[in-house]
């Protein structure tokens, strides 16, 4: 036995598992960017990162607030007096003032139409940690969750890798803007049951830049209520909605429906997308189930948010004037950036999935595929990464059922970089069309030449045939079958 094999025997199955999801093109694109990152002056030919759903559009507002409120940080002269209180061990339930500030912020980000209890707010290390925590609370290894496609590429890691939970895709179609239908849910649920898979719940997220309307949400709640399975709503893009229909939380739906088993309803939230603070690693599990809240709180000790971060954000999120202005601005700025990018694509003849929220669009490049297969999608994606030098995410990495869709993020860069990205896409599209037209012209010319050649050959045959006939009739040298010479 080789040394490597012996060493592997000493490791866990998890350590040797390939189920983390790193093999996905979603992560490969990030590596391409990391190896050759674009910079306007130092590396203008580098790869532009458009595979990262990050909100950098309102960081100036946060910076300005920090300047005006230096006492909010324990690392400033104005806030140093609180250093000892914050630096010591804190209960992993989280600072009370922080949980209250988060609950209030969640209410305001949802238009003040719902109320959240601070005691149900459980901290976690980003939405990644929150999603995994809720899986540990709701399912055992081998159990499964229904997840409509396309879905967030990293769900394969967040939901499955350490928990052993299975994902059952619910296939949705572009024919209705990838909306979730009851028929698709019932079909996926029935197939899972027929194969002996235990379905524990349904997870809905937003990888498309769309928001769910009231009717769809009511249908989903009715579905899980009838099946008595859980509903986990990933609401991390709540404040990025910029057009109708506005964002509707599942919390709003269940307070309006006549009968709902609230123990089955859970929300995942974070400050990464709405506030543009992914580096702060603030995730939230909000559950209406007391047992889940208790379990999630105990598990939160494995992924705490630092007390320094909690203290700082508690101060900022408690400033209602700042929060109200921030929420208005983030919606305006996302709308402006979305319009800028989609309008630029439209001028090239590229359409996108109709969207009203999020930090990205689903770009339709089906017309640029060699054929309608995922192999062709991957071939096109490699060209975009290596030649166009833009990192976008192919639909297959989001388990999209149709090849040719690409998720492109537009809020993680400045406007100048976005314009450079649009120029690169334009050059690529124009070049692709020119090549196709050239190939088409060559094919047409070849067809015309072949047609001319065949026509010439046909006429030549007719001409030769005619000449032979005339020669047969007129030539004195031609010996007739009845010639006495032949008979002799």
From Swiss-Prot:
MF annotations from Gene Ontology: catalytic activity; pyridoxal phosphate binding
Task: State any GO BP term from the record.
Answer: biosynthetic process
InterPro entries tied to this protein? Aminotransferase_I/II_large, Ethylene_sulfur-biosynth, NHTrfase_class1_PyrdxlP-BS, PyrdxlP-dep_Trfase, PyrdxlP-dep_Trfase_major, PyrdxlP-dep_Trfase_small
Assigned keywords, A-Z: Pyridoxal phosphate
Task: Determine the domain of life of the protein's source.
Answer: Eukaryota
Q: In which tissues is it expressed?
A: Expressed in young leaves and flowers. Not expressed in roots.
Q: Which Pfam families does the entry mention?
A: Aminotran_1_2 (PF00155)
Q: List the disulfide bonds.
A: none
Q: Which PROSITE patterns match?
A: AA_TRANSFER_CLASS_1
The entry assigns this protein to a family as follows:
Belongs to the class-I pyridoxal-phosphate-dependent aminotransferase family.
In terms of PANTHER family, this protein maps to:
1-AMINOCYCLOPROPANE-1-CARBOXYLATE SYNTHASE-LIKE PROTEIN 1, BIFUNCTIONAL ASPARTATE AMINOTRANSFERASE AND GLUTAMATE/ASPARTATE-PREPHENATE AMINOTRANSFERASE-RELATED
Q: How does it assemble?
A: Homodimer.
Q: What is this protein called?
A: 1-aminocyclopropane-1-carboxylate synthase-like protein 1
């Amino acid at each position: 036995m080789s040394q490597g094999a012996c060493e592997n025997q000493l490791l866990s199955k998890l350590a040797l598992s390939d189920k983390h999801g790193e093999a996905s093109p979603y992560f490969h694109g990030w590596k391409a960017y990391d190896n050759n990152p674009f910079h306007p002056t130092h590396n203008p030919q580098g790869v532009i990162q458009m595979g990262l759903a990050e909100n950098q559009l309102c960081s100036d507002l946060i910076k300005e607030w920090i300047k005006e409120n230096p006492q909010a940080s324990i690392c400033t002269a104005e806030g140093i007096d609180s250093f000892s209180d914050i630096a010591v061990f804190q209960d992993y339930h989280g600072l009370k003032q922080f949980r209250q500030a988060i609950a209030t912020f969640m209410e305001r980000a949802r238009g003040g139409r719902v109320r959240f209890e601070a005691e149900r707010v459980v901290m976690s290390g980003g939405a990644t940690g929150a999603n995994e925590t809720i899986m540990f609370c709701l399912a055992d290894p081998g159990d499964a969750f229904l997840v409509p496609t396309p879905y967030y590429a990293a769900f394969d890691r967040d939901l499955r890798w350490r928990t052993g939970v299975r994902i059952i895709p619910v296939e949705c179609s572009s024919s209705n803007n990838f909306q979730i239908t009851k028929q698709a849910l019932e079909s996926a649920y029935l197939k899972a049951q027929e194969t002996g898979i235990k379905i524990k719940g349904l997870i809905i997220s937003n990888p498309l830049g769309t928001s769910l309307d009231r009717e769809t949400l009511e249908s989903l709640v009715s579905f899980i209520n009838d099946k008595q399975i859980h509903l986990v709503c990933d609401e991390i893009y709540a404040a990025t909605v910029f057009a109708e229909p506005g964002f509707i939380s599942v919390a709003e739906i269940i307070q309006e429906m006549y009968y709902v088993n609230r123990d089955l309803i859970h929300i995942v939230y974070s400050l990464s997308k709405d506030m543009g603070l992914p580096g702060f690693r603030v995730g939230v599990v909000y559950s209406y189930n007391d047992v889940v809240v208790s379990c999630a709180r105990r598990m939160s000790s494995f992924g705490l948010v630092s007390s320094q971060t909690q203290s700082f954000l508690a101060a900022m999120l408690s400033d209602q004037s700042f929060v109200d202005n921030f929420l208005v601005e983030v919606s305006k700025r996302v709308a402006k950036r979305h319009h800028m990018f989609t309008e630029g694509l439209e001028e090239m003849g590229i359409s996108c999935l109709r969207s009203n929220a999020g930090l990205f669009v689903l770009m339709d490049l089906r017309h640029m595929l060699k054929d309608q297969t995922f192999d062709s999608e991957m071939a096109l994606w490699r060209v975009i990464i290596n030649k166009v030098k833009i990192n976008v995410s192919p639909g297959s990495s989001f388990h999209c059922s149709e090849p040719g869709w690409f998720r492109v993020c537009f809020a993680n860069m400045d406007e100048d970089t976005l314009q450079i990205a649009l120029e690169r896409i334009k050059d690529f599209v124009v070049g692709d069309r020119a090549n196709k037209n050239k190939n088409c012209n060559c094919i047409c010319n070849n067809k015309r030449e072949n047609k001319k050649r065949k026509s010439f050959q046909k006429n030549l045959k007719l001409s030769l045939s005619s000449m032979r006939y005339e020669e047969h009739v007129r030539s004195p040298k031609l010996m007739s079958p009845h010639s006495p010479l032949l008979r002799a």
